Amino acid sequence: MMETMPNWLKQRAFLTPDRTAIEIEEEKVTFMQLHEKVVSVCEHLTHVGVKRGQKVAVLMKNGMEMITVIHALSYVGAVAVLLNTRLSREELLWQMDDAEVICLVTDQDFEAKDIPVYSFAEVMNGPKEEASIQEEFSLREAMTIIYTSGTTGKPKGVILTYGNHWASAVGSSLNLGLRDDDCWLACMPMFHVGGLSLLMKNIMYGMRILLVPKYDADFIHKALQTRGVTIISVVSKMLTDLLERLGEGTYPSSLRCMLLGGGPAPKPLLETCVDKGIPVYQTYGMTETSSQICTLSADYMLTKVGSAGKPLFQCQLRIEKDGVVVPPFAEGEIVVKGPNVTGGYFNREDATRETIQNGWLHTGDLGYLDEEGFLYVLDRRSDLIISGGENIYPAQIEEVLLSHPMVAEAGVVGMTDDKWGQVPAAFVVKSGEVTEEEILHFCEEKLAKYKVPKKACFLEELPRNASKKLLRRELRQLVEEM
C-alpha cells in the first residue's frame, strides 16, 4: 500500500493547469492560479513562523482566503485546526488551548491573550520568506483537526490524516461516479468536514467548485438553473427552501445529485423531488468518518424511505448490542470501519480507546439494518439535537445553565421547530429568584446563537431514575405537551 502521494494541489495544477478550479460569484480561478496563490500565502505564513508539524487555528468564512490558507498549511506541513465561526469566544479559546495551536489566522476581529492572532490581510501585507514546500504528503500524517462534541458535551479534536481525506474522496467517487463536466456547488461551511471534503474532491478530481460564501437560498436556486451545477450538498432545510423557490418548475437534467445529510428527510419532501426529477442521495456520516460513510442511492429514495443506505465501497458497517453483532431489524449501536475513519482524538487517549476498537468506530448512534443491509438511523447519539444541520449537545448547554448562581438543576432536550427541524428547550430547577429572560440572556453570553435554548421552563424537580440519571424522554414528553 502506498505511504505517500504527490502534493495534491501542485499535482493537479501540473496535470490540468488551465481548468477552472474555483468560481466565487463572477471570479474564476484555474488550478495553476490557485497553486500560485497558495504558494504566496505559504511564503507569508512561513515569515510569521509557521513550520512543519505545528498546529494553526483557522477562523474564517467560506471564501478564496480560507481555501488558500487551508492549502498553504498543507504545503508547509502544518496541521489546520478548523474553527466554527458560529461559536462563542469562550468556546473558541477553549478549543485553541486544547489543540495547542501556535497561532490563529482569521478574517475576523478576535483577541486572545496567550495566542498570536494574525488577520489574513495582515499576513498578506507582511514580508515573504522562502518556504519549504512539501513535495509529497505522507498518508499517515495529520492534515486537519476538527472539533466535535461527545455525549459528555466536552469537545474533542478529531484528527484526520491525508489518508483519511484521500479515502473519503475515493469512496465518494466510486459511489457517485465522475464526469468531465461535474461542478459541485459548495454552500456548506468549510470548517465542517462536509464542506472541507469538497475542497479535497476539488483538487483530487480536478472538478470545478462553485463556492457560495454565505448561505443564500435565492442565489443557490438561480445557480442550479444557470451555472451548470451537477452536484450539491444540502440538509433538509436547504432542500425545503429550494423547493419553495422552484414552485411548479424543475431543475436542469444536468443536476445529477443532491447529497442530503443531517438526518433523514420527510417522505412528502422526497415525493416532491421524485415528481420533479431531482435525484436525492441520503447520507450518513460524521466528522470521525471524514464526511459520508453511507449513502442511499436515488434509485431507493422512495422504496427505502428513512434509510441512509449502504456503506461506501471500501467501508464496513454493523450493528452491535453489548459487544455482539445483532441480526437484521435488531436495534443497536452503529459501528463502522474504513480507511476514511479517524485514528483518534487529539490528546484524548481514553476517548480514543473507548470509541475505536480494532479499527471499528463506535459511533454512539442507534440504528438497525434491514434484511438487505440498508441502514436506518434511529437516534443521532440519542440525546443529540440537530438544528439546521448543526449538531447541538444538551450536556454543553446544561453545563452553562448550571454555572448560573440561581440554577440548581438543568436538563435540555430538542423541541420541534418548523424552520430548523429542532431547537433546544431547557428545563430548570431554581435555587433562587431568576426569570426565563435572565436565563436565556445568560446563555446568549456563553453559547453560540444556535445553541441558546428557545425556551426555559421551571420545574420543582427534574425527572430522574433510581440512579438519579436524568430521564430526558420525560422532558421530551413535557415539550410535546407544550
Curated annotation (Swiss-Prot):
Keywords: ATP-binding, Ligase, Menaquinone biosynthesis, Nucleotide-binding. Pathway: Quinol/quinone metabolism; 1,4-dihydroxy-2-naphthoate biosynthesis; 1,4-dihydroxy-2-naphthoate from chorismate: step 5/7; Quinol/quinone metabolism; menaquinone biosynthesis. GO terms for biological process: menaquinone biosynthetic process. The keyword ATP-binding applies. Its EC number is 6.2.1.26. The keyword Ligase applies. It comes from the Bacteria. SUPFAM superfamilies: Acetyl-CoA synthetase-like (SSF56801). It catalyses: 2-succinylbenzoate + ATP + CoA = 2-succinylbenzoyl-CoA + AMP + diphosphate. This is 2-succinylbenzoate--CoA ligase. The gene is menE.
